[in-house]
Structure formats: C-alpha cells, structure tokens
C-alpha cells in the first residue's frame, strides 16, 4: 500500500497528527459496476460517516466517484465550493452517451445549485463545455494552466471565504 510508504511525522506541526485526530480506514466494500449504483453507494457511505460527525476522505483514480461522494455534503451545507485540480474541465453534459462519465463528473456536481466550482490547472476544454461555462460564470472560476504565473491567490481566498470546501484531484 502506498500509504505505508509515507512518513507519519509532520515537521510543521511537530507531531504525528494521526495520533491526535485519529484515522480510520474502512474495510473494502463492493462497488457495483453500474455507475449509478456505485455513486449511490458512495453517497450512502459518506452520509453514514457524516452522520457520525466524522470527516470522510474518499480516494479514487479520478473524479468519477465525486458526484456520489459530494451528495451528503450538498444536503448538510448550504454553500459548498468544489475545489478541483485537473488538466481537464470535466464539464461535458455526457461523454460517449454516458451522463456519469469521467468527462462529465464535475458537471454532475454542479447539478446541485449550492455547489460552486474553482478549477486549478485546466489546460483542456471541449467546445461543448464553453456554453455551460459562460452561462454559469458566477458559479465557476477557472485558474487556467497557461496563466499559472498570473494566478491571483488573494482572489482565490476571497472565493472560498465562509464556504465549506470539497477537494477533488485527478491523478
């Protein structure tokens, strides 16, 4: 496991944080190959964790799981900022006929009106995503990869102020 190769000591905090806050890894559970059922399962698992007043962290290979994972947060919090790190916008309505594709995962998250989006590092966007991006410019801010030397991090801080932030990384 990759997590076994990480040092547990944090030099900034001068401690091993897991000893103070605790970390629990769930036992692996079966995920259905049907994407809608899989997303429903992820939503249910995260809801159970939130109901226990714990903080869930979910890991997948890319953003396909995010629309399911974020559902309990959309119910619990009135204003959520989805902080998205990726090379692609993932704002398509569907991809190859699949509404819940990796290429439309972030769009599915924005189906919830209380979710806003900040994307960092986008270098690719399809023509079909542009109208949605323009129509929702009040909810979406993209920090383009080509402009990284000009990113205004103070603007970023203002965008997330007083919001609950949900992080998603495409790896």
Language model segments and positions:
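Conserved alpha-helical scaffold segments that buttress catalytic/binding sites
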Residues: 1-171
């Amino acid at each position: 496991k990759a997590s076994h190769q990480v040092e547990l000591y944090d030099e900034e905090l001068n401690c091993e944080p897991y000893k103070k806050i605790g970390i629990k890894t769930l036992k692996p559970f079966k995920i259905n190959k049907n994407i809608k059922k899989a997303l429903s399962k992820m939503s249910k698992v995260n809801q159970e964790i939130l109901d226990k007043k714990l903080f869930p962290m979910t890991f997948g290979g890319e953003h396909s799981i995010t629309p399911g994972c974020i559902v309990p947060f959309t119910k619990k919090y009135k204003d959520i900022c989805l902080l998205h790190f990726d090379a692609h916008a993932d704002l398509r309505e569907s991809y190859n006929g699949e509404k819940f594709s990796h290429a439309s995962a972030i769009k599915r998250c924005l189906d919830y009106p209380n979710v806003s989006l900040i994307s960092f590092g986008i270098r690719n966007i399809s023509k079909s995503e542009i109208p949605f991006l323009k129509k929702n410019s009040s909810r979406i801010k993209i920090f383009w990869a080509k402009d990284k030397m000009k990113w205004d991090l103070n603007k970023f801080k203002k965008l997330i102020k007083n919001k609950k932030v949900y992080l998603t990384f495409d790896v």
